[in-house]
């Protein structure tokens, strides 16, 4: 069975400018805009917003 195109893999990049990335899936139907999640950045040592890369 093929993977769904409605839930693509997206890269989340730290807004702190450290170059740290997370990889996750998102539902395009529910979240058509860029995804922003607050996650831990080990280089910065704190929780920062991670924004979806295009």
Swiss-Prot record:
GO terms, molecular function: structural constituent of ribosome
Keyword Ribonucleoprotein: yes
Family of this protein: Belongs to the bacterial ribosomal protein bL33 family.
One GO CC term, this protein: cytosolic large ribosomal subunit
Annotated keywords: Ribonucleoprotein, Ribosomal protein
UniProt keyword annotation of Cytoplasm present: no
InterPro entries, sorted: Ribosomal_bL33, Ribosomal_bL33_CS, Ribosomal_bL33_sf, Ribosomal_zn-bd
Disulphide-bonded residues: none
Gene3D superfamilies: Ribosomal protein L33
Gene giving rise to this polypeptide: rpmG3
Pfam families (alphabetical): Ribosomal_L33
UniProt name for this protein: Large ribosomal subunit protein bL33C
Recorded superkingdom: Bacteria
